[in-house]
Amino acid sequence: MLWWKLGRHFPDFAAMKHLLLLMILCISSVQATGRPRLLVLTDIGGDPDDQQSMIRLMVYANEFEIEGLVASSAGTMGELKYEVTKPELIRAIVTAYGGVRPHLMKHREGWPEAEWLFGRIKSGNPKRGRDFIGDGQDTEGSRWIIKCVDAGMKERPLAITIWGGQTDLAQALWRVREDRGGGGLAEFVAKFQVYDIGDQDKIADWMFAEFPGMYYILGRPEEGADRRLTTYRGMYLGGDESLTSRKWIDENVRSKGPLGALYPVETWTAPNPHACMKEGDTPSWFFFLPLGGNKVEDPSKPGWGGQFRRTAEGRYRDLPFTEGRDPRETVSRWRPEFQKDFALRMSWCVDR
């Protein structure tokens, strides 16, 4: 090439060439690693809406670096008669994703291989709550959380989305403090960001006191408020609810290959106008999805994942329900947009 010849005769040009190559490599590295890093804690195995959210996540897998899919205690507290984790439900969805991945690759780049995702499916603690955090309570899931957080940096934090309980995250934090002390804990919490759906293990306030400094969005109404008015319920309540109907799901999701065929058509929560699509956990990862419009550095800004207010303690909470303002609308207002995009991506899962 001409620049190699010029470099022999003009040393300054050779240095310029080296600098240019370095810049290209840096730009390529940024492009390769610019996607949000994501770890999911899911109580999959209770209300089928976790399976719904996981299926949707699979057709957005190219938009993230999915670093962990942790099956925490199945169901919400008291929902099931037994204590169990169900990572096999995640594996079934990833298997179906692997079947449609060749089709997805025709439309976008960056889809992880199913085998790569299998290696990131972990099991957490089948028990939940404060009594199961501490010595002897480490799990495959809590250890994996530590590993993923440690692998990152403050400038590129891990997004931890909690679809179920927080027990495995709390155990990871307890272990880090136990092994590394307060300074090590402070370094650790600076490298992740949390969006918690519902405070299902009822330990959020305890966690804030025990492990200060976390970036933490808590999707939970104020004490005594109607829990149906929580931001994340805008995924299926309010706005154009025809977009959550069985008819819409059959036409746009379940008919689109083996991944869509797994999409459950009945969920457990009432009220739900169609008792079909719920996906109450989806706003947690919508918030970190670049095309969803949210500003991670300022959760008060609008986007698919909702809007939040900063509290005096430094965490983020739902906007209050007032006359003329429903916090669910901060999600439901975007339903035509995010359902249109979901339908498009599901259409990629089949040959045309």
PLM ranges: what are they?
Residues 15-16, 33:
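Intrinsic disorder/low-complexity segments
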